[in-house]
Amino acid sequence: LADYVSCALGRKHALKVKPITRQDLIEQWLDQFREMLEASATIGLPPFGGVHDIREAVRTAVPPHCLEPEELAIVAETLDATHAIVNWADSLNEDAIQLKTLCQSIGDFKTIADTLRRIVDGNGEVRDDASAKLRSVRTEIANAQIKIGHVVDRLLRDRHVTRWLHYPEATFHNDRLVLPLAAEHRGRIPGIIHRSSDSGATLFVEPAEAVELNNRIIELRYEERTEITRLLLHATRQLFLNHQAILETLDALAVLDLIVAKVRFARNYELACPQLSSDGTLRLYAARHPLLIEMQKEAQKRSEHRDVVPIDVRLGDDFDVLVITGPNTGGKTVAIKTVALSCLMAQAGLPIPANEGSTVPVYKDIFVDVGDEQSLQQSLSTFSSHLKQLMIMLTRAKPTTLVLIDELGAGTDPDEGAAIGQAIVRELLQRRCPAMVTTHLGALKSLAYVEPRAENACVEFDHKTLQPTYRLLIGEPGTSNAINIAQRLGLPPKIIAVARQHLSESHLQLTRAIRGTLQSRRQAEKARAEAEAAKRQNEKEKIAAQRELHALQEKKKEFQKWVETVSSLRPGDRVHVRRFDRSGQIVRVQLHKQMAVVNMGAVEMEVPLRELSCLPPSND
């Protein structure tokens, strides 16, 4: 996110982004993002060119301390840039309530910026014309330097003088122009000896003819420094008098830049703004893991093809616990990581890697146990480490907690692991705690058939290619497919037959029971998905219709305002003619022709009324 900001102000904010649990504040952040996304499509993103983090300079702008010219140049550039951002904010749609509220804190400091620019230029140098006094002093310095130059040039053209010098060049000592006289020719050039070289072989002499001129330049340099200090103090005082408003503006610009970064981030990763659900229901449509999206983009740069398979996930509507089963490397872990990231991003006020219409609750806690987190220092086994994490989760499990567990029951005897896994799932169900768990233990599948608030899911497996498709199928338990895969890979039929004989009767009964309900479950899931898709489409069309209606109403208001304005036009009124970008004066109005005759200086022209806008009366 920090890579998508426009300036250092936004970067500092982006690096502090983290999930929170205040729903009102999350709603505000997401509304700001939505409004910026819409604004970017109509008036573009705010122009941040020239904005710098000048907060430290503004804080230290306390007389008698003076800011340096380089600092003032950067401050001027930043304050000048706020003028363009204020103009951008004035163009926002009336519906952009959050952005308009934020931009009310952005002041227009163009007047102060102009004051600073009259003192320092863009390179951080004090301008010659910063004041009449400074121009006069610098002009006199330049003239005195020219006169000294003439004196030195004349001396260096004298071949006797050049023989007395160690080298035929003038140099400076304490702002005084001196000549490098060889010590053996001491006294040959009338003047003042200011110093000698370390060896004593060279004496640095100020020619007598240049002494008065050098004295005058030193006096003028002092006057120059005094005047510059006065000017810098004046500029610093302007900042001091407005420092609170400027700091508030910079804080608002930092937030605005962060919102812009979110929009750029969303465009690059194809993210969407989630809705916050009030009933605790989680619905993710076409969710993708951001790192997989990044890997896909990197592959495209190398002209390689890489698919990112989206998943649809729901939780909390007709079930609280989703048990994802199936073989390893099938995408189970990626699924729960995708859900975890989507929820955390939403609660940080960020767009999420899912489609429009996705809804996310505000969880008070999100617990994730993924992979082997055993601690060598505590000498914990894989299972012990896993169990320790689960115990922490269970103490905090409640309806506002999201629990995500990878490979529940792993790391120990499969039967005992499955028993513990079932007990943990039942505890989560009893607490109405929303959870997603992955496992390769088949015994956990049966829970969904006896617990009404539990549901199975699997990562789809292509039996033809013997590869997972990575699609998440809710309502269908997964299978390891180990025997089928072994058979397709050519394991001898005799061994396959023996392997099937070793399958337990309970396993076979469960498999037959699952197969018997699978078709009806698929049909029900398909019907539910189609109904939800239709509902989302209706919502999308409703929102689009409301926006179109609002746009028409705004145009109607503008038209009515224009009609009222045009109807009130009288001879002598000042108007702006858009076609020529010039102002003029109404001579007469021809409402029947929707035209007006306008005097624009030397000419009178007949202009369509639609090209006119009223101007305030002239002060003349």
Over which residues does each language-model region extend?
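Extended, charged alpha-helical "arm/stalk" segments used for dimerization and assembly
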Residues: 1-37, 51-58, 194-200, 208-215, ...
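Conserved amphipathic alpha-helical "coupling/scaffold" segments
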Residues: 1-137, 242-263, 270, 286
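Amphipathic alpha-helical coiled-coil segments
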Residues: 26, 30-33, 40, 47, ...
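Extended, Lys/Arg-enriched charged tracts that mediate electrostatic binding to polyanionic substrates
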Residues: 135-186, 255
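Long, charged, glycine-rich C-terminal linkers/tails
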Residues: 156-173, 261-286, 355, 455
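SMC-family hinge/dimerization module
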Residues: 169, 173-205, 214, 276-310, ...
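ATPase nucleotide-binding head domains, primarily ABC-like/P-loop NTPase cores
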Residues: 269-270, 277-517, 521
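Conserved core positions of repeat-based scaffolds
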Residues: 450-455, 459-620
